[in-house]
């Protein structure tokens, strides 16, 4: 009995002395008693004995960010028992030791942390004091970010607020919307502000809703970026990245003669953005030079997704302007509603030809005239070239002359044999026979661009490769107001 009291007294003195517990491999050392009564660390080969109450602390790995749990030390008497009254008798199980949370100093949060977590532009300028505020409330960076928290965080930065953007020049106006050139206070970058009025009884145009729903999920270097959405009682404002001009304006500025190397770069980027859309099961369905935006670096981006996934392709816009037929495939012109990714590939072929020659391939003003232009160059279809065409009521109504197909190379002499072959594969009567965007990128026409261009991540520009450079145009005008009278800055869908 005296021997046990001596052991308890020694243990009590140790605890009162505040001797810390060494940590090995992130776990506390166990204190035990051997047969001789001496206190010491347990051998790794032995089973650990009961730990002394009030001394053990939870181990925390060096990289853990969870708050540390600390068992509260109890005052111990000379016999090794607690001086505090116990609610249990000696033959009952002792209650668990009370715990308290140890608060660690808040983790420093960087601008890079915020940009990565909230998917912000790298050049964003955060409001003064925002970093400090987040540092005090950093748990949102220690756990998955809910949609509500992300929305609140973006709002605090300035997203979703009209006052974050400065309107500069008016670029276009339609029945439902006005488009402005603007500037972001967050980045100092130029933006395009598409302000859609909601005072109409039917609310926001379905094209705008469709465009928003698609673009917020499409992240690609060759697709225009939707930066922000601002919804008020009277308007819906879409904030897009701002690009210098569209392909039509680029053609105008070049005197309709684009360097063939640049034609190849523009076509590859068009196919690259389109292939990404098609992988996402999205059809553009309104490809034309005015919907392809180009910046000073030569980056081409698909814009205006207002008709994507539409149940039908209208002949007029919201401002009652006629939608151009020049880039519409013959199967759609003849009433087909069997939409697939090949619907876009015909338009790619027409745009390819226009870049190579400086003029539209099929400039019809009515459906009948448009088909006439197509058949005069590609030949009037027969049952052999287009099975089932003779039973098409629309086709029979027009009663076209029997044209023979002409060589495309004779109409586009600047194309080499590979270019003419690719153009032929794009301009097939039946959609199922047209080459896909993915396969077109692998066509021999693009061999000179090298292999690395096919291995880039979706969000990386082709101009990130040192071997890819836009060549200087022989007659490029730098005027901000082309002869057509339109500003040399194209934004997304100025037609409504």
From Swiss-Prot:
- The UniProt annotation puts the region (Disordered) at 1-97
Write down the superkingdom of origin: Eukaryota
What happens upon changing residue 12 to A?
Answer: Abolishes phosphorylation by BRSK2. Abolishes effect on insulin secretion
EC category name: transferase
Where on the chain is Phosphothreonine found, per UniProt? Answer: 175, 380
Amino acid composition bias (Basic and acidic residues), ranges on this chain: 69-78
| Sequence positions that bind ATP | 171-179, 194
- Alphabetized UniProt keyword annotations: ATP-binding, Cell membrane, Cytoplasm, Cytoplasmic vesicle, Differentiation, Kinase, Membrane, Nucleotide-binding, Phosphoprotein, Serine/threonine-protein kinase, Spermatogenesis, Synapse, Synaptosome, Transferase
- Tell me where in or outside the cell this protein is found: Cytoplasm; Cytoplasmic vesicle, Secretory vesicle; Cell membrane; Synapse, Synaptosome
Which reaction(s) does its UniProt entry say it catalyses? L-seryl-[protein] + ATP = O-phospho-L-seryl-[protein] + ADP + H(+); L-threonyl-[protein] + ATP = O-phospho-L-threonyl-[protein] + ADP + H(+)
The known PTMs are summarized as:
Phosphorylation of CDK16 is essential for the binding of CCNY, but also essential for the regulation of CDK16 kinase activity. Phosphorylation of CDK16 is essential for the binding of CCNYl1, but also essential for the regulation of CDK16 kinase activity. Ser-146 and Ser-153 are the most critical sites for the binding of CCNYL1 and for modulating CDK16 kinase activity. Phosphorylation at Ser-153 inhibits kinase activity.
Catalytic residues (positions): 286
Its BP terms in the Gene Ontology are: exocytosis; growth hormone secretion; neuron projection development; positive regulation of autophagy; protein phosphorylation; regulation of cell cycle phase transition; regulation of insulin secretion involved in cellular response to glucose stimulus; spermatogenesis
The annotated topology with respect to the bilayer is: Peripheral membrane protein
Regions of biased composition (Polar residues) lie at 83-93
- Carries keyword Nuclease? no
What happens when you mutate residue 194 to A?
A: Loss of kinase activity. Abolishes effect on insulin secretion
Sites where Phosphoserine occurs are at 12, 36, 42, 64-65, 78, 82, 89, 95, 110, 119, 138, 146, 153, 155, 391, 478, 480
In alphabetical order, the GO MF annotations are: ATP binding; cyclin-dependent protein serine/threonine kinase activity; protein serine kinase activity; protein serine/threonine kinase activity
Q: What does this protein do?
A: Protein kinase that plays a role in vesicle-mediated transport processes and exocytosis. Regulates GH1 release by brain neurons. Phosphorylates NSF, and thereby regulates NSF oligomerization. Required for normal spermatogenesis. Regulates neuron differentiation and dendrite development. Plays a role in the regulation of insulin secretion in response to changes in blood glucose levels. Can phosphorylate CCNY at 'Ser-336' (in vitro).
Q: Which family does it belong to?
A: Belongs to the protein kinase superfamily. CMGC Ser/Thr protein kinase family. CDC2/CDKX subfamily.
Q: Know the name of this protein?
A: Cyclin-dependent kinase 16
Instruction: Record the organism.
Output: Homo sapiens (Human)
